Amino acid sequence: MSVTQAISQVCGYLPSPYDYTCSTLISWYGPSLIKMMEDNYTPDVICNVVGVCTAESGQTCSLFPNPKSSKMLNGLMSKVEFEQHVAEAKGKYGESFKGLKFNACDWFPAACRIGDHKPVFDEDGDLFSTYGPLRGSDWRGQDCDDTHNGIFPGRHDLDIATDNNCNGIFGVDPTTNVPFEKQWCEGTNSMGVAILGDSATAHFRIPPAYLTASKLSAKTFSNFIRNIENELDFPMLSWSTGHRRTEEFAPDVDGPVDSIYMRMRQNNLCNHNDYQNIGVNGASSGDLKKFSNILSRDNLITPLPQKPVLLFMAMIGNDVCTHDAIPRNTPE
């Protein structure tokens, strides 16, 4: 079996229609990619030749250490040498990739509609959805009526005839004529929980099996589409807004789930379904104001009264993602 055939076999593990797209790309471009690897070109050089790297003017698109320099003993290529090296590779292999326009949105169009970090499927525009991924109920409480923007998790209402806040409590006690929402929830300090932050907030995770050749199989990618639609994040299993069991996402995740939301719900069932995770991969502290504008407690979104919310702001991943080795990033 050739290397190209072996890679095509891996493509077959992907769910439809991505298996066909992957196999097609490999059949077209696989031989040239493999030849470049055999010629010891680094991933950065290959990405530059293929054309999937973008960089600001005057910057070099690189992630890994530059290749070794032929001019310096035990040294790496300078920026100028690296750019010349890339130009040589383009001259040798560029024709093979001419016309290739790689756009992830062509593969996952729905996933590219979440740039504003709001639910993709939200008919009534209340920031809550009946669909799980794509910033839906995996991230925020599940909408119980996506055709009515006055019905959403976190609303402060007596719910006499309808469960307007989607916590499962509505109706009136026939013996006292008191709404159940008032009877059970009034005076209990019921509230929601929300968090604004980065990839650590969103619980970013690449399933290890995706990167382990010996574990590649159709089962490995059984949750592939959902994982991509959730940006490789697992907010439904996070420490802040976790509300699901890892067994539902096997084999990608295992172990117990515990969260602030689960503890608050355990202490007071009036808090059921009232959570929001606005964690974004690669976010910085400067994004927090923007994120706060899509928190459903914003009165500019709805004038209807809403319950209080316990709000966290967490930029936990900055130490990992920053390019600057400043003192606060050191273990000390």
Predicted regions span which residues?
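Short, solvent-exposed beta-strand-terminating loops
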Residues: 196-212
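Soluble non-cytosolic domains of exported or imported proteins
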Residues: 5, 20-24, 36-41, 156, ...
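Extracellular calcium-associated, cysteine-rich motifs in secreted modular proteins
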Residues: 93-187, 192
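Solvent-exposed, polar/charged alpha-helical surfaces in well-ordered, non-transmembrane soluble domains
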Residues: 5, 9, 31, 44, ...
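Conserved beta-strand elements of the Class I
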Residues: 192-196, 311
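Conserved SGNH/GDSL esterase-like catalytic core that processes O-acyl groups on lipids
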Residues: 216-331
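Extracellular/luminal segments of secreted precursors and ectodomains of membrane proteins
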Residues: 1-116
